[in-house]
Design a protein with these regions (language model features):
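Extended amphipathic ligand-handling, pore-lining, and cofactor/metal-binding catalytic surfaces
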Residues: 1-286
Length: 286
């Protein structure tokens, strides 16, 4: 409401909504945009011509910024350990259940980000993807993440670089979870070298990517939003809850015909313990 009041004072006539969640999720981007719509519907803020940026999971500059953070993170390991570092991508686990029940595209989009990153790196390191929360926004570490550390140690992988893949800033709770609690679990499992890549924060390429997205959203285009995964189309008829914040977004971009979109290979694969030099990335399995 404070932002809306400031917009009124400054004479803003058009709005671009840019939720800072790279991967669309019903309970993140969807909830944020639905809340904005509810404020307008309830006449709490003025209606203005509005466009929204739904996701940027595979945006080139976002991916390149993440790639640079990986390079920087690898430099923190002893030189002799760098070739054997496993990249462990860390994503929220809170909404994965919704991906199954509501066909939320979140999980699939996370995989697309990881795939794009590892393709850019030519699969130069072994990698895994872990969802770090079993549910809720607390600081409890998921069983999945604990198991990942144990599996890596048993496989002789004792150097791990954790890369936050759907966190764009270093929030206190996230930093504490990954750099303190997860480190304790990793060391207890036998991981000898453990580092967490820096968040994107104000990385120049990331900011450029966001700028490009905003410009593209206000330039007239005949291009329709694309759905990255054939299973990602959320169900229709989301509205109906009493609380405005609980509404699902009414204009999700993932409602196109699935037959017209490319099929992704979502969720079955969470990485590879082999690098490109020893294994074809197309054939990797969980």
């Amino acid at each position: 409401l404070d932002a809306a009041e400031k917009m009124k004072q400054e004479g803003v006539t058009h709005v671009v909504l840019l939720p800072l969640f790279p991967q669309y999720g019903i309970e993140t981007t969807g909830r944020a945009i639905a809340h904005w719509e509810a404020l307008i519907k309830n006449h709490e803020i003025a209606a203005r011509p509005t466009t929204a940026i739904w996701e940027f999971a595979s945006n080139d500059k976002y991916v390149e910024a993440l790639n640079e953070r990986i390079d920087q993170g690898l430099q923190r390991f002893p030189r002799k350990a760098r070739p054997d570092v496993t990249i462990l991508f860390a994503a929220h686990g809170t909404f994965v259940g919704d991906s199954k029940d509501n066909k939320d595209p979140y999980c699939c989009l996370v995989h697309h980000t990881v795939d794009r990153l590892m393709q850019k790196r030519n699969h130069d390191h072994a990698f895994k993807l872990s969802f770090v929360r079993d549910g809720g926004w607390g600081t409890s570490i998921s069983i999945d993440l604990k198991n990942q550390f144990s599996d890596l140690a048993r496989a002789g992988k004792r150097a791990v670089l954790v890369v936050p893949v759907d966190y764009v800033t270093e929030q206190f709770d996230t930093a504490y979870m990954l750099d303190v609690k997860a480190r304790t679990e990793a060391e207890a499992s036998g991981i000898a070298y453990y580092h967490v890549a820096a968040g994107l924060n104000c990385h120049p390429l990331f900011i450029e990517g966001l700028t490009d997205l905003v410009v593209e959203s206000i330039v007239p285009s005949s291009k329709k939003p694309e759905m990255l995964c054939v299973e990602a189309c959320p169900r229709t008829g989301w509205h109906g809850k009493d609380e405005p914040e609980g509404d699902k977004c009414s204009v999700c971009p993932f409602l196109s015909n699935p037959k017209e979109n490319k099929t992704a290979r979502p969720s079955q694969r969470h990485g590879s313990l082999s690098t490109a030099s020893t294994r074809d990335p197309v054939s990797r399995k969980s």
